[in-house]
Amino acid sequence: MRCPFCRHDDTQVVDSRVSEDGAAIRRRRRCSACDKRFTTYERVELALPAVVKKDGSRTEFDRRKIVASMKLALRKRPVAADAIDAAVARIEYQLLASGEREVRSEKLGELVMNELRQLDTIAYVRFASVYRRFEDVSEFADVIEEFRRAAPAKPPRKR
């Protein structure tokens, strides 16, 4: 594997271990030329369905896009990176289990919203506001009211 720092193609694996979610192997590598260390992840490559966009065009499923959009929604929220990876893995599993060769972008967005709903309600509202193209405050209020109806009553916060 090439070193990302000096582009030399001779690197050694210093340490290998299974990631916390068990879906990847984490490897620490050292470049023999510049002696810098870096981390790589090895995952099984699966045949995920193509994504059909709203305009009808098709594109490959890109895990990085899902992770990036979830991280944006979760920005400055107390959610660990491992939890995001696990959520994306669940989305991928659902897509694989469906057996479909294509998935509409709307369906993919709904899967992301379902995962965000479980991770962090603020992130869910952020993502939903962009994904569903909220146009006024009442749409935010409707989503928040959904949560109030679904969530059990919490005792008042002590200050």
From Swiss-Prot:
Domain ATP-cone as annotated: residue spans:
49-139
User: What Pfam families does this protein map onto?
Assistant: ATP-cone (PF03477), Zn_ribbon_NrdR (PF22811)
Which GO molecular function terms does the record list?
A: ATP binding; DNA binding; zinc ion binding
> Which note does the record give on the cofactor?
Binds 1 zinc ion.
Function in brief:
Negatively regulates transcription of bacterial ribonucleotide reductase nrd genes and operons by binding to NrdR-boxes.
- unnamed zinc-finger residues: 3-34
Q: Which organism is this entry from? A: Burkholderia thailandensis (strain ATCC 700388 / DSM 13276 / CCUG 48851 / CIP 106301 / E264)
Q: Which domain of life is it from?
A: Bacteria
Spell out the NCBIfam families in the cross-references. Answer: transcriptional regulator NrdR
Keywords of this protein's UniProt record, alphabetized?
ATP-binding, DNA-binding, Metal-binding, Nucleotide-binding, Repressor, Transcription, Transcription regulation, Zinc, Zinc-finger
Which cystines does this chain contain?
A: none
The coenzyme or cofactor needed here is: Zn(2+)
Q: Name one GO biological process term.
A: negative regulation of DNA-templated transcription
Give the protein family: Belongs to the NrdR family.
- Provide the protein name: Transcriptional repressor NrdR
